[in-house]
UniProtKB/Swiss-Prot annotation:
Name used for this protein in its record: Cytochrome c-type biogenesis protein CcmE
Major localisation: membrane
Gene Ontology BP, a term: cytochrome complex assembly
UniProt record similarity statement: Belongs to the CcmE/CycJ family.
Species this protein is from: Shewanella baltica (strain OS185)
Region feature (Disordered): 143-162
Transmembrane segments: 9-29
Cellular component, GO annotation: plasma membrane
Positions annotated to bind heme: 131, 135
Keyword Transcription: no
NCBIfam families: PRK13165.1 (NF009638), PRK13254.1-3 (NF009729)
Keywords noted in UniProt: Cell inner membrane, Cell membrane, Cytochrome c-type biogenesis, Heme, Iron, Membrane, Metal-binding, Signal-anchor, Transmembrane, Transmembrane helix
Length: 162
C-alpha cells in the first residue's frame, strides 16, 4: 500500500471513529435527560406491552388522580406526601418539598415529575395540576379511562360574608 492510500485510510478510519464517538455521547446525554411517562399501575406492575418497570433513580413523570384522604403535610415545612392512583388500581406515593399549585386538591388529576426512590416513592421536583375543567393531559386521560369527574361549582353557594 502506498503512503498516500495509507494516509487516506487512516483519515477515513479516524473520521468514522470520531462520528461514532460523538453519536454515542449524544445518545447517552439524551437518554439521561429523557423523562418517560408512567401511570401508577405501570410503576407497580410494569408497562402492559413490554412489562418494563422504571428503574430506581430514573427520572419519570407519573400521572393520575390524587387519592382522597392521602395527603399528609408537615406543619413545620413545605414537605407534603400524597398518593396518586389510576383506574387499574395502581397507587404510588409522591413526596414534594415545595409549594403545591393553587388548583391542586384531592380527587383531581395531576402529573408529577421526579426521581423514583428505592422505596417506590416518587420524589417529585415538579407537580402540575389540571388547569381548567376541560383539560387533562392526554396520557392521564387515557390512563384514567377518562373517568375523571368534572366539578360543578355553579351549584355551590358562596359563603355569606355578612
Amino acid at each position: 500500500m502506498n503512503p498516500r492510500r495509507k494516509k487516506r485510510l487512516t483519515l477515513a478510519v479516524a473520521l468514522i471513529g470520531g462520528v461514532a464517538a460523538i453519536t454515542s455521547l449524544l445518545l447517552y446525554a439524551l437518554n439521561s435527560n429523557l423523562n418517560l411517562f408512567y401511570t401508577p399501575s405501570e410503576i407497580v406492575h410494569g408497562k402492559t406491552d413490554t412489562g418494563v418497570k422504571p428503574e430506581i433513580g430514573q427520572r419519570i413523570r407519573v400521572g393520575g388522580m390524587v387519592t382522597v384522604g392521602s395527603m399528609v403535610r408537615d406543619p413545620k415545612s413545605l414537605h407534603v406526601q400524597f398518593a396518586v392512583h389510576d383506574s387499574l388500581g395502581g397507587e404510588v406515593l409522591v413526596t414534594y418539598d415545595d409549594l403545591l399549585p393553587d388548583l391542586f386538591r384531592e380527587g383531581q388529576g395531576i402529573v408529577a415529575q421526579g426521581v423514583l426512590g428505592a422505596d417506590g416513592k416518587l420524589e417529585a421536583t415538579e407537580v402540575l395540576a389540571k388547569h381548567d375543567e376541560n383539560y387533562m393531559p392526554p396520557e392521564v386521560a387515557e390512563a384514567m379511562g377518562q373517568k375523571h369527574e368534572k366539578l360543578d361549582y355553579s351549584q355551590q353557594k358562596a359563603p355569606d360574608t355578612k
